């Protein structure tokens, strides 16, 4: 233990031959003089600007308003129907989605006629409603579902004899089946079982009085 360590074991780290980057320090000026023509003083030691320095007259917070500087009433945001025509604007007003418009929309060449037509239709909505209700009660075919176009074309292509034949509602299922399936449907019981059921004595069906109790 004692042979591997010595009292001056850390002494070799501080020898001059190990300190290769150690040199005598150079002389330096304690208070260097300011370079002339390159720097100008604009503030004092405390940070106050000198009187000859140009300043901006605008405020640093141009849009800032304090609590007491706010207006009493802030107007609502106005909608700008820029790309909406007059017809679309009138449609929105009839739907009730846009009540107040501050700016006029772009007017197209045929917007005046369409606007008059729209206003006329809106006025006649309440007048046309009772007539439509009477039509609904008169027409019996309205409850039936509408046929697609392909069925209408097939009905027109059929001859008049086939179109005139109505299909009864209470059609028997056996009549709609082919003759081969009708013949296959025979009575469920053979004749021997039916005869046995007819000639069965009544004693089998009736129970004695002791069993009934």
From Swiss-Prot:
UniProt KW keywords: Cell membrane, Cell projection, Cilium biogenesis/degradation, Cytoplasm, Cytoskeleton, Membrane
Region of interest called Disordered, as start-end residue ranges on this chain: 127-213
A single Gene Ontology CC term: ciliary basal body
GO BP: any one term: cilium organization
Annotated Polar residues bias: 151-213
InterPro entries named in the record: Fltp
Signal peptide region: none
Cell compartments where the protein resides: Cytoplasm, Cytoskeleton, Cilium basal body; Cell projection, Cilium; Apical cell membrane; Cytoplasm, Cytoskeleton, Cilium axoneme
Pfam families registered for this protein in UniProt: CFAP126 (PF22611)
Family: Belongs to the Flattop family.
Function as written in the Swiss-Prot or TrEMBL entry: Microtubule inner protein (MIP) part of the dynein-decorated doublet microtubules (DMTs) in cilia axoneme. Acts as a regulator of cilium basal body docking and positioning in mono- and multiciliated cells. Regulates basal body docking and cilia formation in multiciliated lung cells. Regulates kinocilium positioning and stereocilia bundle morphogenesis in the inner ear.
Name of this chain's protein: Protein Flattop
Native source organism of the sequence: Danio rerio (Zebrafish)
